[in-house]
UniProtKB/Swiss-Prot annotation:
Cross-referenced NCBIfam families: PRK05463.1 (NF003969)
Enzyme category, top tier: lyase
Keyword Protein biosynthesis listed: no
Classification via HAMAP family: Hydro_lyase
Gene Ontology molecular function terms on file: lyase activity
Family: Belongs to the D-glutamate cyclase family.
Cited PANTHER family: D-GLUTAMATE CYCLASE, MITOCHONDRIAL
EC number: 4.2.1.-
InterPro entries in the record: D-Glu_cyclase (IPR009906), Putative_hydro-lyase (IPR038021), UPF0317 (IPR016938)
Sorted UniProt keywords: Lyase
Name under which the protein is recorded: Putative hydro-lyase Arad_8587
Length: 268
């Protein structure tokens, strides 16, 4: 966990403004929004499942790097004082018995079904996109104003308690000459997935067609570019599906919680 005291004087207006827009009903992928602020995936579970997930995350830190865990029944986080986790993401998913039951812009009603929900905020690779762009590496889904493509792989996560599932990865096409740079830059952010888990050869990790991601939108891959894959915080949603979790609330893939924490706080 990062030390928060020295961050109290950071100007967080961009992050607050984005969250206010989402609370008012704006729906959009958050890649490229409030650049410079850490974004987080989210999964919310009844207390009975919280330890299983905490153990799952501990055993699979590349895919599930935990940034914060709430107290049971709380809908707040120290990563953004004053924010409401029920309302301040652009889009939520509600899961019942391992199946997607609904998507909503306000999770208050679903949240009220269980008095003891525990929220987990998980590092997101959007956090290191800003330094990659600053280094001159194009991020295609930002250029095209689309969602990042995400794929379910054949890479099994370590099970924990009642939870099991395979890793989900995000993909960014990178010019061959810049792959090492992309790996170096992202590798400096181990708390938000870190360096790539796979480069090229998508079939080796069970991806049959890059044009058909399980989550998000497909993106163009230009000549001379290589698909580069990072562990992804949608992995918990794959575990919800594979494990038949009775109830969960998550972010919708690509629609993150924007924190008040600067990206630089997670720079190793």
């Amino acid at each position: 966990m990062i030390a928060l005291d020295h961050l109290r004087h950071v100007n967080v207006e961009a992050a607050r403004t984005a969250r206010a827009r989402y609370r008012a009903g704006t729906v959009e992928p958050t890649s490229g929004i409030a650049p410079g602020f850490t974004q987080a995936n989210m999964i919310v579970l009844p207390r009975d499942w919280a330890f299983d997930f905490l153990l799952y995350a501990q055993r699979n830190p590349r895919a599930c790097p935990v940034l914060d865990v709430s107290d049971p029944g709380s809908h707040t986080t120290l990563l953004a004082p004053g924010a409401d986790l029920r309302k301040d993401l652009p889009l939520y998913r509600v899961w019942r018995d391992g199946k997607l039951a609904e998507e909503t812009t306000d999770a208050t009603a679903a949240w009220g079904e269980h008095p003891d929900l525990v929220s987990f905020l998980i590092g997101c690779s959007f956090t290191f996109e800003t330094p990659m762009v600053e280094a001159g590496i194009e991020i295609r889904h930002i250029t095209d104003r689309s969602n990042v493509p995400m794929y379910l792989t054949n890479k099994a996560c370590r099970p924990a308690g009642r939870l099991r599932g395979n890793m989900v990865v995000s993909m960014r096409p990178i010019p061959a000459s810049r792959v090492a740079d992309a790996a170096t830059i992202s590798g400096r952010f181990p708390a938000v997935h870190g360096a790539p888990v796979h480069v090229g050869a998508p079939e080796e990790i069970g991806i049959k067609d890059l044009a058909k991601p399980e989550f998000g939108d497909p993106v163009r891959i230009e000549p001379g570019e290589i698909p580069v894959f990072w562990a992804c915080g949608v992995t918990p949603q794959a575990a919800v599906m594979a494990s038949g979790v009775p109830f969960a609330i998550t972010h919708a893939p690509g629609h993150m919680f924007i924190t008040n924490i600067p990206d630089s706080a997670y720079h190793a």
